[in-house]
Amino acid sequence: MVTTVDSVSERGTVREVLAGANNAALRELSDFVARWGCSSVSPFHAEPGLTMVDLCGRGVVGYAAIRKWAVLPADVVTIPGQQEEALAMLLDHLRQVGRRPVFTAVTSQQPYERAGCYTHRIADDPMIDPANFSLDGRRMSSVRHSVASARRSGLRVVPWTQALNAAITGVSEEWLRTKRGGEMGFTLGRLDHFDPATVDCRAAIDGNGHIVGFTTWRSYQNGHARVLDIMRRTVDAPNPTMDLLIADSLSTFAASGVRQVSLGSVPISHGPLGERVYPTVSLRRYKEKFAPTWQPLWLVAPSRVLFPAALRAVAHAFCPDGILSAVRRNP
């Protein structure tokens, strides 16, 4: 069953679509996001369960409806040269349907500030050029030693195949049993949303042929960019498992035409309670091992006055079961 909501202004007709994963209209908008999305967070506009918005062919977004808020993952995805026009259309549309916008992580403040919005630095994106990625040099010594140790222990990396599905699911379920609050969502991927057509999954196999960990990478920029999404391993996996998975992927991406890689944005730390919801300090330290270039991301709210309410809406999008459930993940 497909639900559409249209709004009409002097700029044209804007269409909302909320549908099942097999709906043709939704697939068309998801394809637009995959082709034109330039931000590492842009693939999450097409997450299952989000309302997708067609901005007269100029742009596409997805949003989570949280009370009166439209919580958007990232920048408006547009064809070149149409960002400000598409943004104006989106803001007009959301006013007409009675929703306030909050953009969770955008790459540039200027278009939103020109539209009268308030911006606040919320995260940093660790970017890597795969063409220049190497394990050589002092800065990469920790990863280099981990990869050597992993290979000595018999670990190897293989791409996803249907035959590995059950084992990968088993690894994920074991990992989730260590997280009492379960999976989060929104711009944090869920394995039950895994689509091999749009997600690159790689698994680590030990010397006995057992899968002990895996990563997933989302595609954007028309297939020329990747963003690290899910990282999971078994409790008894060798310590260097994840280092091997990431380093092996980074070493092979350039040969397959990938020009840009994100290790996944890391929120700015907000103190001890925030760390219990999402452990940003340790995650930032881990990703720094791969020598990325950190680029700032900004949260956009309608105004400074509405910023606290916008943050609460974003928190609800990530933790639909409530912040307390997320806190229980990391006691």
Regions picked out by a protein language model, each given a short descriptive name:
Residues 14-71, 75, 103-120, 125-270, ...:
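A conserved beta-strand-loop-helix scaffold within acyl/acetyltransferase catalytic domains
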Residues 76-80:
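Short acidic, S/G/P-rich loop/turn micro-motifs used as interaction or catalytic elements
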Residues 290-291:
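A structural motif corresponding to the C-terminal end of an alpha-helix
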Residues 287:
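Hydrophobic, well-ordered secondary-structure elements that form the walls
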